[in-house]
């Protein structure tokens, strides 16, 4: 079982890490007042980055509340999100939504991201790979 913490290794920290997601996202999920960009990271855990600017969410109290709620939602869903670098971008109006509505919206975003995840074939399922029997 994956721990449900939000340590430093579960965060996108550098401009290079953010740029990698912005430049070539493999998953893009628009939501109400939010955009979620994701990219495969090749790790056994997901990483999260948040972009919540003053221009879109005016009050610091609202920005901090949003960050707290997004991190909490991510923490509870990180087992399913393993292998993704995810950037969540806040748009105008996100700060005005109530907490229950935000929880519901973030849950839907994670599910939509997982639904859009490209299927990866295991080597045994790939065409042309021998299954151990020789003809």
Swiss-Prot record:
Transit peptide keyword on record: no
GO terms classed as biological process: tRNA 5'-leader removal
GO cellular component: ribonuclease P complex
Residue pairs linked by disulfide bridges in the UniProt entry: none
Catalytic EC class: hydrolase
Catalytic activity of the protein: Endonucleolytic cleavage of RNA, removing 5'-extranucleotides from tRNA precursor
Keyword Cell membrane attributed: no
EC number: 3.1.26.5
One Pfam family from the record: Ribonuclease_P
Biological function: RNaseP catalyzes the removal of the 5'-leader sequence from pre-tRNA to produce the mature 5'-terminus. It can also cleave other RNA substrates such as 4.5S RNA. The protein component plays an auxiliary but essential role in vivo by binding to the 5'-leader sequence and broadening the substrate specificity of the ribozyme.
HAMAP family: RNase_P (MF_00227)
Subunit note: Consists of a catalytic RNA component (M1 or rnpB) and a protein subunit.
Protein name, per record: Ribonuclease P protein component
Record gene name: rnpA
């Amino acid at each position: 079982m994956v721990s449900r913490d939000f340590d430093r290794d579960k965060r996108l920290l550098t401009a290079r890490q953010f740029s990698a997601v912005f430049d070539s996202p493999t998953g893009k999920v628009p939501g109400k007042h939010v955009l979620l960009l994701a990219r495969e990271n090749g790790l056994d855990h997901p990483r999260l980055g948040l972009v919540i600017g003053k221009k879109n969410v005016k009050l610091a109290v609202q920005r901090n509340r949003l960050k707290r709620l997004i991190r909490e939602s991510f923490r509870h869903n990180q087992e399913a999100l393993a292998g993704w670098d995810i950037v969540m971008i806040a748009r105008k109006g996100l700060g005005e939504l109530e907490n229950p509505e935000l929880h519901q919206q973030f849950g839907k975003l994670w599910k939509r991201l997982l639904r859009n995840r490209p299927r990866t074939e295991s080597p045994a399922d790939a065409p042309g790979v021998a299954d151990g029997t020789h003809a």
